[in-house]
């Protein structure tokens, strides 16, 4: 994990001496490179969850070193070694956001869904909500979720405990507090902890629907 960005980079392999893939490259790569050598892996692909710099910083280094095939657009499921990889379009945080389901039981969710939080709706709130509720959280509850930042979680845990999901499911009430974001009036539907220890907010603008934004952008009217 990157000490500043808190972003993750992953190495997934089928077995020692077998085949592996990288997922994102925004964290320090030395531990992953060391694992490739120690486990004598043949790495074939670089899976890119989205194009933001805190997830792509090491892409060129990895491509040059290993001659990797890069997966950064939707495509049919494919197999490399003993790994079967499904590419799930999950836009909302960014238009190009992808999640990757490996061997049917581990999903790399990028910046769409975190442990206890969700990504900012930088490109489309409707797409973000749909990607979470109709794609990621329809996977089996035991599916491991490895997000783009900080801690691992699971589909079942986020379905039951994620505060954004609970509001979307109608399990918890929406807030009524007034606030503003960038000078625009809004209602603060939800104020919740984010992956970095700060806050994230679901706001309903008076003039333009819902958005998920970083808490630092919200002026609360307490």
Which functions belong to the PLM regions below?
Residues 1-39, 99-110, 116:
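Conserved beta-strand hairpin/beta-sheet module of binuclear metal-dependent hydrolase folds
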Residues 11, 77-102, 107:
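Core dinuclear metal-dependent hydrolase active-site scaffold
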Residues 12, 24, 50, 62, ...:
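Divalent metal-coordination and catalytic microenvironments
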Residues 29-72:
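Active-site metal-binding motif and surrounding structural segment of the metallo-beta-lactamase
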Residues 46-56, 88-97, 145-152:
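Histidine-centered catalytic micro-motifs
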Residues 130-144, 150-222:
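Accessory terminal helices/loops
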């Amino acid at each position: 994990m990157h000490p500043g960005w808190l972003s993750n980079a992953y190495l997934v392999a089928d077995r020692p001496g077998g085949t592996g893939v990288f997922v994102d490259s925004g964290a320090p790569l030395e531990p992953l490179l060391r694992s490739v050598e120690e486990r004598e892996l043949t790495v074939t692909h670089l899976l890119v969850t989205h194009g933001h710099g805190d997830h792509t910083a090491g892409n060129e280094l990895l491509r040059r070193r290993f001659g990797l095939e890069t997966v950064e657009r939707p495509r049919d499921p494919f197999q490399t070694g003993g790994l079967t990889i499904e590419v799930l379009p999950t836009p909302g945080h960014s238009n190009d956001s992808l999640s990757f389901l490996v061997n049917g039981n581990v999903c790399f969710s990028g910046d769409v869904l975190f442990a206890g939080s969700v990504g900012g709706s930088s490109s489309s709130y409707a797409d973000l909500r749909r990607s979470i509720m109709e794609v990621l959280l329809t996977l089996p509850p035991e599916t491991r979720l490895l997000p783009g930042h900080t801690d691992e979680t699971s589909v079942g845990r986020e379905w039951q405990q994620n505060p954004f999901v609970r509001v979307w499911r109608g399990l918890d009430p929406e807030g009524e507090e007034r606030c503003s974001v960038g000078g625009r009036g809004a209602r603060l539907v939800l104020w919740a902890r984010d992956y970095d220890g700060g806050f994230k907010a679901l706001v309903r603008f008076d003039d333009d629907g819902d958005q998920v934004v970083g808490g630092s952008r919200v002026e609360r009217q307490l």
